[in-house]
Amino acid sequence: MEALVYTFLLVGTLGIIFFAIFFREPPRVPVKDKK
């Protein structure tokens, strides 16, 4: 059970960090708008 808990915590932490960076610095690759 410890492996499951550690995996969940790791994924949660990585997700929070990823979303924090993503929302703080919006992606600069507007491919769809560029025609």
Swiss-Prot record:
Pfam family, one: PsbT
Annotated compartments: Plastid, Chloroplast thylakoid membrane
Subcellular location, principal: plastid
GO biological process: photosynthesis
Key words of the record: Chloroplast, Membrane, Photosynthesis, Photosystem II, Plastid, Thylakoid, Transmembrane, Transmembrane helix
Transmembrane segments: 3-23
Superkingdom, natural source: Eukaryota
GO cellular component: chloroplast thylakoid membrane; photosystem II reaction center
Protein topology in the membrane: Single-pass membrane protein
Annotated InterPro entries: PSII_PsbT, PSII_PsbT_sf
Similarity comment: Belongs to the PsbT family.
Function according to Swiss-Prot or TrEMBL: Found at the monomer-monomer interface of the photosystem II (PS II) dimer, plays a role in assembly and dimerization of PSII. PSII is a light-driven water plastoquinone oxidoreductase, using light energy to abstract electrons from H(2)O, generating a proton gradient subsequently used for ATP formation.
HAMAP family according to UniProt: PSII_PsbT
Subunit-structure text: PSII is composed of 1 copy each of membrane proteins PsbA, PsbB, PsbC, PsbD, PsbE, PsbF, PsbH, PsbI, PsbJ, PsbK, PsbL, PsbM, PsbT, PsbY, PsbZ, Psb30/Ycf12, at least 3 peripheral proteins of the oxygen-evolving complex and a large number of cofactors. It forms dimeric complexes.
Protein name: Photosystem II reaction center protein T
Annotated source species: Chaetosphaeridium globosum (Charophycean green alga)
Name of the gene this protein is made from: psbT
